[in-house]
Amino acid sequence: MRLLTRSDFDGLVCAAILKGIGIVNEICYVHPKDVQDNKIKTTKNDVIANLPYVKDCKMWFDHHSSEIERLKLKGKIDGSIEPVDSAARVVFNYFKARKPYSQIVQKFEKLVNIADIVDSAKFTKADIMNPQGWTMLPFITDPHSNFGKKHTFSISNLQLLKTLPDLLCSKTADEILAMPDFMERVTAYKKDIKEYEKILLENSTVAGDAIVVDFRGMEHVPIGNRFLEYFLFPKQNISVRAVDGKNKKFVTISLGHSIINRTSEVDVGHLTLGYGGGGHKRAGACQVSYKDADTVIQEMLQIINNKNINYYSHRYTVHE
């Protein structure tokens, strides 16, 4: 069977488990919005993990609260959806409870624990300022780190990610990071991080509880760490980030709770669902047209700062 999943660390761990226990033999990385917009053709030969639900798939695993809210599917699907820290945890729990997989899946427990930490952003200051091992590897796979936009590596980011599920089954993080294609990215991260911090400060403003990061119109954003902003603005408890979408056809707006000041009560998945996106309580994203982006951002800031978390508008289009 084929697995459809995201190309972030959580999706990669889902892939490692499902391939490692013999459920899938092919892996395809797709964007969640393409799934929502029915741009991905699926069949009963497909397993979907860490992505929106598609009714004609064989099995589906997810943990995003927006999907629970959107579909009311618990108990009505082949697979599982749970509001836990990672989709990898959902996959692990499902097969741990089922023979003949209950024993073989146990070898992935440590990896799933790491996926929980990564996807729920339970990082320390040391993890962000000096990432190593199982912290550095997820940052390399994070789409927000901008590795995919740098075209001077020996192999593309997609080619690199295709190798990772098998590597996660057999090697430690340090062994993986010592491989040339990964070491190349570690070097690039260390080279770019100071420039990224400078550009981040130049393009960030504070709006009450929120850090607003606006990278729209920037042709080059250095490789960086999306959690750095929380250390630069420790009094704020949530970030709102705007970047150009693919081929500048739309604006992607991402929201995330601070990992330093964990006082935000905004349900980000619920909020972004109202704009055609999704996520879980602490993080999520949506895509809106350029003409609507400023209005959407201001509306989100009003919701965040007025604590009016039940309000959102459906007036906005995704693409111009």
Where do the language-model regions lie?
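Active-site loops and adjacent core secondary-structure elements that bind or stabilize anionic groups
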Residues: 200
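Short, surface-exposed loop/turn motifs that are enriched in glycine and acidic residues
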Residues: 182-190
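Long, charge-rich alpha-helical interaction segments
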Residues: 143-183
